[in-house]
UniProtKB/Swiss-Prot annotation:
Function: Effector that acts as a broad suppressor of cell death to interrupt plant immunity. Inhibits cell death induced by cell death-inducing proteins, including the PAMP elicitor INF1 from P.infestans.
Residues spanning the signal sequence: 1-23
Keyword tags: Host cytoplasm, Host nucleus, Secreted, Signal, Virulence
Classification of source organism: Eukaryota, Sar, Stramenopiles, Oomycota, Peronosporales
GO cellular component, one term: host cell cytoplasm
Subcellular location: Secreted; Host cytoplasm; Host nucleus
Protein name in UniProt: Secreted RxLR effector protein 11
Motif RxLR-dEER: chain residues: 49-61
Record's comment describing the protein's domains: The RxLR-dEER motif acts to carry the protein into the host cell cytoplasm through binding to cell surface phosphatidylinositol-3-phosphate.
Presence of keyword S-adenosyl-L-methionine: no
Source organism, top-level taxon: Eukaryota
Keyword NADP: no
């Protein structure tokens, strides 16, 4: 009798375990598509967030600069610049040197010489190929930003298209470096007896 009771009890336990297991499997089977769907959605969301982050970084890194955007970024600083200062005169000499434009002996005349930059507007591709050093590129753009030369922004935008790897930070840093070297208070152009270096056109 004891043996039969033991077998009966063992059978009941086994049946209960089997029933519970089947019920659990049924619930799991019922929920698993939803669970898989949620996992898939979460995975998709994570992927999208990751892609947005990557794309956002790429967009910021490779966003095309424009002369208008640079002017907005340097609006206050540009207003404080003195076109006749020693520093800006030296910038003109440097830009003319970079582009192979002959520099006059008297520095104030070099301000007029900068207008010759516009002659290369239709040759922006040649200028872009010639000027490969990022520092030189930044200075050319900086010169076009500082001086209100006719069609300067048109030329600048064309050059920026040709120099997609030139970072905005490089231009801004060059600007601040120029500004820090500027003569304080009332900057004056070079005296008549002070001659800028003569640059022979290449």
């Amino acid at each position: 009798m004891r043996l039969n009771f033991t077998k009966l009890f063992a059978g009941a336990v086994a049946l209960a375990w089997t029933t519970e297991s089947m019920a659990t499997n049924a619930v799991t089977a019922h929920l698993s598509p939803l669970s898989r769907s949620l996992d898939h959605i979460q995975s998709d969301d994570s992927t999208q967030r990751r892609l947005r982050t990557i794309n956002g970084a790429d967009e910021e890194r490779f966003s095309r600069m424009s002369m208008a955007g640079l002017r907005r970024a340097l609006e206050l600083e540009l207003k404080e610049m003195h076109l006749e200062s020693v520093a800006t005169n030296q910038l003109v000499v440097r830009i003319c040197t970079i582009l192979g434009i002959e520099v006059a002996k008297s520095t104030p005349t070099n301000l007029n010489k900068l207008a010759e930059l516009i002659k290369v507007e239709k040759e922006a591709e040649n200028v872009a190929k010639k000027v490969q050093n990022p520092v030189d590129q930044a200075d050319v753009i900086l010169g076009l930003l500082i001086y209100p030369v006719k069609q300067g922004d048109v030329l600048g935008n064309k050059l920026l298209e040709k120099w997609p790897l030139l970072p905005k930070k490089a231009i801004i840093n060059r600007f601040h470096r120029l500004k820090n070297h500027e003569v304080p208070k009332e900057p004056q152009p070079f005296a008549a007896h002070v001659h800028a270096p003569v640059v022979v056109a290449h």
